[in-house]
């Protein structure tokens, strides 16, 4: 009865248009008040526990780092470097946009931020060179999802907090899948470009390539600092996020000098707004997850699945279906916090590696970001291009098939996610 009330109330509130965060919090709070022996105080305690979770402290720092990198002109230099590397190939500007998304993803940890930073520059450049606007918008919208797969990743931080999994291992596990997805997108773009006879830029000289690499160096160094620092043990992922924020501010203000000190309050305010919005969603989702845990739903489902005799591949198929459906209607962090505690104990029973499960969930969240009606990347792409939302959806959906094929690869070939952590002795 309790669980039926919880989920029916959640779906009812979402159906009548109540914001997702409020729906999660309200359904969880009413369930506790009406059916649980817990006191009203537990509501406040659970909500405030979010703000003191050490792992989640990485989120505002990564958001701040991405804000400084975007405002400070790092994205433009990364795009110039990507164009210098692959622009001479047929379809090179589109391939360069994917490469730029991969590079910026390694700095920001956010898919919408990656789309906004790269799309605002790369799509306009493609249109000027004769590419259809819809082609460029579809590519950047999909490639921008790499922002939560290539480390650092805010969604990975949330999964780690929900399941008590190592953030460092998740970051390392995301490297190979992120590079593989980027490579697959590039190959498909090249094939399409050959068929459609899309233009190529003149090959740059070695001097020009070195000049673009030198300008992008300070941005590229941040990737080495984050991953190198975590793997070497110099600092934890949360400390790495703080280092990234300070480093990004230093580069934007004193190295590239694309920002003035007077612009810092605006950057801090914008990243603060994003942090508050995301943490409000996370706090309410954690309250909802608390109700699930109190009612022992994950344990009950795990026992039921074990009794059914589901094989690991069948369970992972169910996981993907549930996550793909949820991704159409909910924000990634909320999905992770609600469903990860349910799937996690079942995966442990079936011998599925928690890191592998985490990467599968992240890839599903990538797909959710580009599927209507609430795919955030679609709205960001529409905003930076000026295209109607319907046209943006039509531009992005053909590329969605690539992500679905990639999801199958990641799901049923665990080595894609686990090979690098195992090789580095992090298993």
Swiss-Prot record:
Q: What is its main location?
A: membrane
Summary of the knockout phenotype: The dctA-dctPQM double mutant shows no growth on malate and fumarate and residual growth on succinate.
Keywords of the record, alphabetical order, are: Cell inner membrane, Cell membrane, Membrane, Transmembrane, Transmembrane helix, Transport
Classification via InterPro entries: DctM, TRAP_DctM
Q: Name one GO molecular function term.
A: transmembrane transporter activity
* Any one biological process term the GO annotation gives: C4-dicarboxylate transport
Q: Which organism is it from?
A: Pseudomonas aeruginosa (strain ATCC 15692 / DSM 22644 / CIP 104116 / JCM 14847 / LMG 12228 / 1C / PRS 101 / PAO1)
Miscellaneous section:
The DctPQM carrier is more efficient than the DctA carrier for the utilization of succinate at micromolar concentrations, whereas DctA is the major transporter at millimolar concentrations.
State the family named in the UniProt similarity comment for this chain.
Answer: Belongs to the TRAP transporter large permease family.
How does it associate, per the subunit comment? Answer: The complex comprises the extracytoplasmic solute receptor protein DctP, and the two transmembrane proteins DctQ and DctM.
The protein in question is named C4-dicarboxylate TRAP transporter large permease protein DctM
Please state where this protein is localized: Cell inner membrane
NCBIfam families, A to Z: dctM
Query: Any transmembrane segments, and where?
Result: 2-22, 55-75, 91-111, 115-135, 138-158, 171-191, 216-236, 237-257, 274-294, 310-330, 335-355, 359-379, 396-416
Instruction: Please give the function described in this protein's UniProt entry.
Output: Part of the tripartite ATP-independent periplasmic (TRAP) transport system DctPQM involved in C4-dicarboxylates uptake.
User: What do we know about what induces or represses this protein's expression?
Assistant: Expression is maximal in early exponential growth phase and declines with cell density to reach a plateau in the stationary growth phase. Induced by the C(4)-dicarboxylates succinate, fumarate and malate. Positively regulated by RpoN and the DctB/DctD two-component system. Negatively regulated by DctA.
Membrane topology, record value:
Multi-pass membrane protein
Tell me which Pfam families the record gives.
DctM
Q: Which GO terms describe its cellular component?
A: plasma membrane
């Amino acid at each position: 009865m309790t669980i039926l009330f919880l989920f029916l109330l959640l779906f009812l509130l979402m159906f009548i248009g109540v914001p997702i965060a409020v729906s999660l919090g309200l359904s969880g709070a009413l369930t506790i008040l009406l059916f649980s022996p817990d006191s009203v105080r537990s509501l406040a305690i659970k909500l405030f526990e979010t703000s003191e979770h050490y792992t989640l402290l990485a989120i505002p720092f990564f958001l701040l780092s991405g804000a400084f990198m975007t405002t400070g002109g790092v994205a433009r230099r990364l795009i110039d470097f990507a164009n210098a590397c692959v622009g001479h190939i047929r379809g090179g500007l589109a391939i360069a946009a994917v490469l730029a998304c991969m590079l910026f993803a390694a700095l920001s940890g956010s898919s919408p931020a990656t789309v906004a930073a790269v799309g605002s520059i790369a799509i306009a450049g493609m249109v000027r060179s004769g590419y259809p606007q819809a082609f460029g918008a579809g590519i950047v919208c999909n490639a921008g999802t790499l922002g939560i797969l290539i480390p650092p990743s805010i969604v990975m931080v949330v999964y780690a907090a929900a399941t008590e999994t190592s953030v460092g291992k998740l970051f390392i596990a995301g490297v190979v899948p992120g590079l593989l997805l980027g490579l697959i997108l590039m190959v498909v773009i090249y094939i399409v470009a050959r068929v459609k006879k899309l233009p190529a830029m003149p090959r740059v000289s070695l001097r020009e390539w070195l000049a673009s690499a030198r300008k992008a160096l300070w941005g590229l160094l941040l990737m080495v600092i984050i991953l190198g620092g975590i793997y070497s043990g110099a600092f934890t992922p949360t400390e790495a996020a703080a280092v990234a924020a300070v480093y990004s501010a230093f580069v934007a203000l004193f190295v590239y000098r694309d920002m003035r000190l007077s612009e810092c309050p605006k950057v801090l305010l914008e990243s603060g707004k994003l942090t508050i919005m995301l943490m409000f969603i996370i706090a309410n989702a954690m309250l909802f997850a608390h109700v699930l845990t109190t009612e022992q739903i994950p344990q009950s489902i795990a026992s039921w699945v074990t009794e059914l005799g589901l094989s690991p591949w069948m369970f992972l198929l169910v996981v993907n279906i549930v996550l793909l459906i949820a991704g159409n209607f909910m924000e990634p962090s909320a999905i992770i916090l609600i469903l990860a505690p349910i799937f996690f104990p079942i995966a442990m029973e079936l011998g599925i590696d928690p890191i592998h499960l985490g990467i599968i969930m992240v890839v599903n969240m990538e797909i959710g970001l580009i599927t209507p009606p609430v795919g955030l990347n679609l709205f960001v792409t529409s905003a930076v291009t000026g295209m109607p939302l319907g046209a943006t959806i039509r531009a992005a959906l053909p590329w969605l098939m690539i992500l679905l094929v990639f999801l199958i690869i990641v799901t049923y070939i665990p080595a894609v996610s686990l090979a690098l952590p195992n090789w580095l002795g992090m298993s």
